[in-house]
Amino acid sequence: MARRDGRTGQRSVWMMLAATVALALVLAACGSDGESTTADSTETTVEEGSILFNPENRKVSLTIGSKNFPEQEILGEIYAQALAAAGYKVKTALNLGSETIARKAVKTGQISAYPEYASTALTSFFGFKPEEVPSNAEAAQSKANIEFLKEGLQTFNPTPFASANAVGTTREIAEKYDLKTISDLKGVSKKLSLYGSPECRQRIDCLAGLEQLYGLKFKSFTPVDIGLRYSVLEKGQADLSILFTTDPQLAAESDKFVLLKDDKKVFPAGNVIFVHKRATAWEAGSGLELTVQAVQEGLTLKLMQELNARVELEKETPEEAARAYLESGGYIAS
């Protein structure tokens, strides 16, 4: 799907509001600034960029959460730092755990919002089958939003990029068993071990789908921390591992790892949606949606892979990677 350049599109949103926030700009120039407070109470000063600081937003406190892997933490930091730049009092509660834990946290008010994948919400929360998840990002977000509204939650428009689960292996294993698609596992899966996140066992877009829709039975399934999904392959602890299509290792180490084609479409791709309470949106005002939508526009697949690489391969912190994205896009001052 064609998208505008993130920086250009983002600025156009804010330019439309320039007339109504002129006072905010004056106050910002006089020294007002936003803060993003992380879960360990570390404060971060966010300088003014093209995101406009609105002093009225200082009345609103937000806690941004995330699930427990780098991409999620990067997204959580992007939202948190951008909202702090817009004037909100922001804390982070990142690395909460699985989608079930994050959903409970936002429903109970432990956090104000977190990034979720529309396909994950539809299949894991609301009982949709993989084939029932729309391939169109806006349609998937709309369906998820309808379901979330029943819980007092809502979402904003999705990110340009989408991510999906995938079955990966080493090139050595793929060549040994002539594996190109997931269906190719049919005759050999009983000889192979599979590693995945703890929640993978019950998810239809993970082990449950591989068993039910592909008819596969593995020698073993072992729950593993998401951060170890590649090391178990490299160390020979697993023959197969559940990976993500946005993983930077797939491009950086293509000589080592292979993704098997999901020929039966068990793993629907999911664009990210900002899940939050309706009451939060009401309290925060229009600046919440405008800020979230603005910083999302630049999040293409290539860009998200680059941000993931900064954290997973170059060992930057999610906070550092998020700030680099916001600065390079002109959202906040460098």
PLM ranges: what are they?
Residues L25-A29:
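C-terminal motif of bacterial Sec signal peptides marking the signal peptidase cleavage site
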Residues G31-D40:
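Bacterial lipoprotein signal-peptidase II cleavage site
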Residues E43-E77, L94-S98, E199-Q202:
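Extracytoplasmic "Venus flytrap"
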Residues E77-A82, T100-I111, G127, A208-L213, ...:
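Short helices/loops that flank or line small-molecule/ion binding pockets
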Residues T92-K104, P198, K219-S231:
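Short helix-initiation/N-cap motifs at beta->coil->alpha
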Residues A118-K129, A140-A144, V232-L259:
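A ligand-binding cleft/hinge motif common to bilobed small-molecule-binding domains
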Residues P134-L194, R278-A279, E297-L301:
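A conserved helix-loop-strand patch within extracytoplasmic ligand-binding domains
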Residues G152-Q154, T159-A164, P248-V295:
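Periplasmic-binding protein-like
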